[in-house]
Regions:
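Buried hydrophobic core signal strongest for RNase H-like alpha/beta domains in large
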Residues: 1-378
Length: 378
């Protein structure tokens, strides 16, 4: 098993025997670059018996999600502007969602540069319980040396469940918090969500829509989420097209909103206003979009299905934004909103792992040192 250490800010911690990046072939001699294996004796009674799935914190409103969706509505509605107006004011084509978010969140606040270091290897199969136990002990030792009260160790889904079982039954590892790697890394979670979207929307005609842009043989890979980049691009194009259809008549018919949107978009792209300053106009557009979606959903089941599709992909965007901007509350809220779709698509092992992960993350505020929690979530 290999691993990496991520520290923020850079040079905040030093890892003894860290493996430096080199060119060419690496030759390991003896115990250099390796962690001594600590055998793990599995107890007769599984530690999972002491883990109870409790209800997650329920909120009546999600301010972090609503603010993000308002900015998304401004981006989506910008494509409803008349072509002549776009060419006159912006010259080139409008940016994609990623480009728009990069400009909109350019002043999101101060940040620190992180450092990634390669850790020594554990010469065991990663699925071996002794290997996971050794990794947790190594992380715990490094945590104590850095005088940190809490240490986060990330694993992929199968290893996360094993690490959770081990850490729960070992009092000496109480400061170590196993983290579901696929819940904490945005591309992996997005793969699962896009897979859920593909399964839920199977047979709806979405495949035929994608086939107009992508090769027919690549569409199944897009629907399953295995072709991640294509899936994100395809869903983004579909959302953009549907959003324009929903909003175009409403915005063009209202000259006041059209003028406000055009002016706001120009200022936002020019860096003249911040996200907070776009709030009044963004709220209007978001409400207009929501009202129109409710109106269309009431017409028939087909319209309701496609509106639900838009809502599903909005969650993908929210989660991506949370990871890129380091928005802790948006991260938790978007993950909670994804849970029903994991169950609907019968991804039960992943739904179980995400629920346990969220349960642990919600408990951090009470269990962690206040200073460490503030630095971790800011």
């Amino acid at each position: 098993m290999g691993g990496i250490s991520c520290s923020t800010p850079k040079q905040h911690q030093s890892i003894p025997n860290a493996v430096s990046r080199t060119k060419g072939k690496i030759v390991m001699d003896g115990t250099k670059g390796r962690i001594p294996v600590v055998p793990y004796v599995k107890p007769a009674l599984s530690s999972f018996k002491s883990i109870y799935a409790s209800d997650l914190k329920v909120k009546r409103s999600f301010p972090s999600m609503e603010k993000a969706l308002q900015i998304d509505s401004v981006w989506m509605s910008s494509f409803t502007l008349p072509k002549e107006l776009i060419q006159a004011r912006f010259g080139t084509r409008l940016p994609s969602w990623s480009g728009y978010m990069e400009v909109a969140h350019a002043d999101s606040g101060p940040y620190d540069v992180s450092e990634v270091k390669f850790l020594p290897f554990i010469n065991l199969d990663p699925t071996n319980l002794s290997c996971i136990y050794t990794a947790l002990n190594f992380a715990s030792d490094q945590c104590r040396k850095q005088q940190l009260k809490t240490c986060f160790v990330t694993f992929d889904q199968p290893l996360f469940m094993k690490a959770t079982e081990i850490s729960t039954g070992c009092p000496e590892l109480k400061q170590v918090v196993p983290v579901n790697h696929k819940s904490y890394m945005y591309n992996s979670s997005d793969i699962y969500v896009t897979c859920c979207i593909g399964e839920i929307m199977s047979g709806s005609g979405l495949e035929d829509l994608f086939a107009t842009v992508y090769a027919k043989n690549s569409v199944p890979q897009i629907m399953s989420g295995h072709s991640y980049a294509r899936a994100m691009r395809a869903h983004s194009l579909a959302q953009q097209a549907l959003g324009v259809i929903i909003l175009k008549n409403e915005i063009v018919a209202d000259s006041t909103i059209l003028a406000e949107l055009s002016s706001l978009h120009q200022k936002l792209m020019g860096g003249e206003v911040s996200c907070e300053e776009t709030r009044p106009v963004a709220c209007k557009i978001r409400k207009l979009y929501q009202d129109k979606c409710l109106e269309l959903s009431a017409l028939n089941r087909t319209a309701k299905l496609w509106i639900e599709y838009l809502n599903q992909f909005e969650l993908v965007r929210l989660f991506t934004r949370a990871m890129r901007c380091g928005d802790w509350q948006l991260y938790l809220d978007s993950m909670k909103a994804m849970l029903p779709y994991f169950h609907a698509a019968a991804h039960l092992p992943y739904a179980k792992a995400v629920h346990i992960h969220l349960q642990k993350m919600e408990a951090l505020e009470e269990e962690m040192d206040p200073f460490e929690f503030e630095n971790f979530t800011r």
